[in-house]
Amino acid sequence: MMRVLLIRGMLVGVLAGLLSFGVARVLGEPPVDRAIAYEEQMVAGHVAGAGEAGHHHGTTTATVHDHGTAEEPVSRDTQRGIGLLTATVVYGAALGGLFAIVFGFVYGRVGPWDARTTALLLAVAAFLTVYLVPTIKYPANPPAVGIDGTIVYRTQLFFVMIAIAIAAMIVAVMVAKASAEARGAWDATLIGGAVFIGSVILAGMLMPTLDEVPANFPATVLAQFRMASLAIQGTLWATSVLTP
């Protein structure tokens, strides 16, 4: 049973990856290209400024690595094509397999729902904990946004926020189940929801805040990139409902 469910989950994940690739190509790549163009423009301006300063002072005052003219190890055509397709399909397959394993564990244990309803509720819970809550605190950024030296730190904070959100969801479900008999299903759901929301809000307030967006970075590009990220993740998790 679990083997069949795992295979089905991975196949659904591959489908989710293909759909997400389409969403990423249509919605995600345009703001990425504009962000890269912005980065190249900033580098070109920096190089020009450094060269002008060196001309006036008789020496070169700064050395700048020009990302715009340096040969890329992987071309943008490869990145937006086979690279993006491979990434979304592999990620989707792994996500689908993990979703199937978790579904097999929780089905029949968390409520009297049928398989499809359980899958839907699990997908919503996973979307909230693994993506939405951490992203609200630490949103996705396109190229040219962020400091290279803080990449590891930002990644660590994001995963800590995921762990907190998952723990908050587990506690919320336990509280809701404990309250259901005395308060009824509706009140128990509201209580569990309040526990989850309150917990993640408190955690978000206590976690470090990062603000690395350049002051002159186009706000529309940033918004488009983050909306595309939301659409991609939404596609992945919505498709996972087809697992059972």
Which role fits each region the language model picked out?
Residues 1-244:
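Juxtamembrane/disordered regions of integral membrane proteins
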